[in-house]
């Protein structure tokens, strides 16, 4: 009764709405139906951007290979929408997915997703990041709207340490072979190619969102050369686009394992 009374006043209504949006959004229990009877939860206010890119703009539609997927690794899973989208395309074939995500906010949502009865038998969640395992952990900058990164944008940003996963942890958590590894952790694409040869050698396709400022230092051409050295060839790519919020370019490439 008190809440109903307070919402009559614009000031209190705005304060309550603000608190729900930023602190209790998941309590609203919002989910959106996608294809073939699957649903995508919207656990936080900033999840709509990722949902829009994948389900409305069909960001991955024209770049993924035309195969049936059995086992994948989703590196930089965000809220798990890539995996949900891929599963919704093949409703009669269960998709086993290892969701790797460094963000504290996203990992809470992914853990809830993995408990969902529709996904509980096929999703595994791992809180961690891709990097040089010799360093054990790295700084991570939490930002809303898919802007989290291992790179600092300003000296005022706060950070926290995230565990770097090694190859054996990934292989034991989700045994190979893999039909696809998708990597979308800003700046970690180079580390994936340099420090996880046993993992990617047992993968049929690599789907990488590249960033021209990756830690290798020489942009997309360096990534392409590294893929060639690892016996992968580029089979599809998106057009490069100017990055949002910083200088540089971004794009996606699909690479096929020639030894697979």
Identify what each model region corresponds to.
Residues 1-260:
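Phosphate/nucleotide-binding beta-alpha loop and adjacent structural elements of enzyme active sites
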């Amino acid at each position: 009764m008190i809440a109903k009374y307070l919402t009559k006043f614009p000031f209190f209504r705005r304060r309550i709405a603000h608190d729900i949006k930023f602190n209790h959004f998941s309590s609203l229990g919002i989910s959106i139906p996608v294809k073939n009877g699957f649903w995508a939860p919207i656990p936080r206010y900033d999840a709509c951007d990722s949902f829009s890119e994948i389900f409305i703009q069909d960001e991955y539609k024209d770049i993924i290979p035309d195969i049936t997927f059995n086992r994948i690794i989703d590196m930089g899973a965000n809220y798990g929408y890539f995996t949900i989208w891929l599963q919704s395309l093949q409703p009669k074939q269960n998709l086993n997915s290892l969701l790797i995500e460094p963000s504290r906010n996203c990992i809470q949502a992914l853990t809830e997703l993995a408990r969902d009865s529709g996904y509980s038998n096929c999703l595994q969640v791992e809180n961690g990041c891709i990097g040089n395992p010799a360093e054990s952990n790295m700084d991570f900058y939490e930002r809303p709207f898919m802007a989290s990164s291992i790179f600092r944008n300003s000296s005022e940003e706060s950070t926290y340490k995230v565990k770097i996963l090694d190859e054996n942890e990934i292989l034991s958590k989700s045994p190979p072979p893999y039909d696809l590894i998708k990597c979308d952790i800003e700046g970690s694409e180079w580390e994936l190619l340099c420090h996880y040869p046993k993992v990617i050698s047992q993968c049929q396709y690599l789907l990488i969102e590249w960033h021209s400022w990756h830690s290798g230092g020489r942009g997309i051409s360096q990534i392409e050369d590294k893929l060639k050295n690892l016996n992968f060839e580029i089979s599809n790519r998106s057009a490069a686009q100017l990055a949002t919020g910083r200088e540089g370019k971004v794009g996606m490439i699909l690479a096929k394992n020639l030894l697979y």
